[in-house]
């Protein structure tokens, strides 16, 4: 708590106080009730998940230990206990006097209640999904019951355990035979089944590691039945996964995803406090695209290519640096961007943050889904390796040319993802309201702001920045159309190639990343949508002289992650009620 008691020196508002943010004598802890409640919940949540998630020695936690935090599938006992936790904290929250809270703590109340309600809904959904696949794991209760008594060290009847696990192994093989002929198992059911089987493997492994070698009778009776059970569970999981592999792609892309549908998109947008429909977001993206088109033609003409923007883009792509030179090029671009931020006095950059960011190289297999560099504590650089095919090497180099990279190094490092991570670990650390609309939106916002501040040095740099702006427009359009069932993955790939100018391999990687691996449906549209939220708030506060650039940017970083509408509510002192509903229209639609 010592860090939470330090006073935050945040705003000195050019001769006038800005009551919306300097509302308490202790700016770092805006009140005691909400930080304490959320910290206690987070601690309770972590310890319960740890206790009710089994693990084995080779997955952490020691022999027969507890698992890493994982709120996903698990035993019915685990879900029931978490449900009691949620209900208990909802009661504690409702006992607070909302109207007596400070503005920041009202925002915390609203967001914490939102998240508790969401956890209750998701828990009910997970219980239904588990019930759906429970007939395929009728032996689960026996394994979980033994793991439960293991937690308190009860000595088992070793001969009984051996017989039980032998019988379960036979049962699994019978079920696997039935599964082979089963038709119509959904990808969600396959995921639930494989995760449940993995949890059962951990539960059985936890029991075995706890007693084996320590309990003489267990050590004599159980090792062989355990090995056979573990192998059977592994094979059973693989059989479920093969049901997904058998699912045919809808087109030649080979990408098998699962559109969530418009209704679920609307529900998630409401949760993220985005007050636009999917169709309205597509309209916004098209309006942004039109602006990009006009600016791209200006830069193309300046480069001497008339109206042939794709020819200008090709020239920019071919400015790539030789193999082995990309890390040096990234460092040069980083220094240019940080020097620009400091010269314009745009944001406070802690010296330690500048000192400790690192570099990594992206493995070639990861470049299939991350064809460009990524950021965070380190910047991970995508560039070709000796193991890649010639075409893939050239596409990687062309797609990561200096003008493309110059537009986004600040997105990944300072003042983007690296600074976000650095500051979130130091300010308002009790908040756990992370959202891609804040995380990706903030980093994208800097691309918009630096364009306005003439960061690009010439038409090639402008084309690099416009390429990424168009890319983010395209993400909104293709991801929403896909999840509403209107586009196939191949149509999304073709759209990126034809409309944005992507290398085809990079476009395939982008679409695969978006739809495979259970990426959240709204993630890809969060970049430009969140960026426009921060841009609109900048116009509202900095554009009107209420804050300087530095004050605004520092304030956002000190608040920690949350929906941008709540950042606005805090910084502009918007009226907040317990039953708050999203309503902020941060972008003027074209109609």
Description of each model-found segment:
Residues 1-28:
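Bacterial Sec-dependent N-terminal signal peptides
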